[in-house]
Amino acid sequence: MARYRCCLTHSRSRCRRRRRRRCRRRRRRFGRRRRRRVCCRRYTVVRCTRQ
């Protein structure tokens, strides 16, 4: 599986991996279709890069 890094607005210098535990709710709504672009809403996401 591919790993994604999300760059957050409150810490632009650092990119953190999205945490699945907090993203469970978002997962159910979108499913596999928009799974790649969607990250945790708690963080204000700027970019998600595939690595």
Curated annotation (Swiss-Prot):
Q: What function does the entry list?
A: Protamines substitute for histones in the chromatin of sperm during the haploid phase of spermatogenesis. They compact sperm DNA into a highly condensed, stable and inactive complex.
What is any one of the record's Gene Ontology cellular component terms? Answer: nucleus
- The stretch of residues making up the signal peptide is none
Report the locations given in the UniProt record. Nucleus; Chromosome
- What is the tissue localization of expression for this protein? Testis.
Q: What is the organism field in this record?
A: Capra hircus (Goat)
What are the record keywords, sorted?
A: Chromosome, Developmental protein, Differentiation, Disulfide bond, DNA condensation, DNA-binding, Nucleosome core, Nucleus, Spermatogenesis
Q: Any idea what this protein is called? A: Sperm protamine P1
Source species, domain of life: Eukaryota
A single GO molecular-function term is: DNA binding
Record-linked InterPro entries: Protamine_P1
- Biological processes per GO annotation: chromosome condensation; sperm DNA condensation
Query: How does it associate, per the subunit comment?
Result: Cross-linked by interchain disulfide bonds around the DNA-helix.
